[in-house]
Amino acid sequence: MLFYKRFYFMFCCLLIVLFGCKSTTSPTLTVSGLAFYNDANSTIENIKLTVVESAKMVSCNLVEPQSYCGTGFPQARYQGADLVLSWQTSQGQIITRPVLLKQPQKFDASKRYAAVIKFTDPTNFEAFFTVNPRPF
């Protein structure tokens, strides 16, 4: 009889552990595009965004003032890789800087996002994610 009580107790504990626990996977940001916006008053040239680890890159030769250059790509989960951005100003100055592209704290995991590099002037930029207006 004591064996059955112990068995019953252990069985109940096992059920509580198995069915009482919940998997907590954090949602991932899905990225399917990149855009270089030029809000500066001069042309930005030879823009190149490089993933440091793999040396893969995306580039755009010329972005006129108040316009953009963008591309789409197959959707991928954002993994926070180290990125480096380089570009040339209309005066010929070549600038290279690391990019801090943070995943938003709140986002809709059912939507696809585009990474945005927005030049605020010829020598500075902001980097962020926005919902991809063309999520195909």
Predicted regions: what they are:
Residues 1-9:
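Bacterial N-terminal signal peptides that target proteins for export
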Residues 9-15:
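Sec-dependent N-terminal signal peptides
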Residues 17-20:
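C-terminal motif of bacterial Sec signal peptides marking the signal peptidase cleavage site
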Residues 22-24:
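Bacterial signal peptide processing site
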Residues 32-43:
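Asparagine-centered strand-capping/turn motif at beta-strand->loop junctions
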Residues 45-49, 96-97:
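Short, hydrophobic/aromatic beta-strand segments
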Residues 49-90:
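Tryptophan-paired
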Residues 95-136:
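Extracellular beta-sheet/turn segments enriched in Thr/Pro/Gly and aliphatic residues
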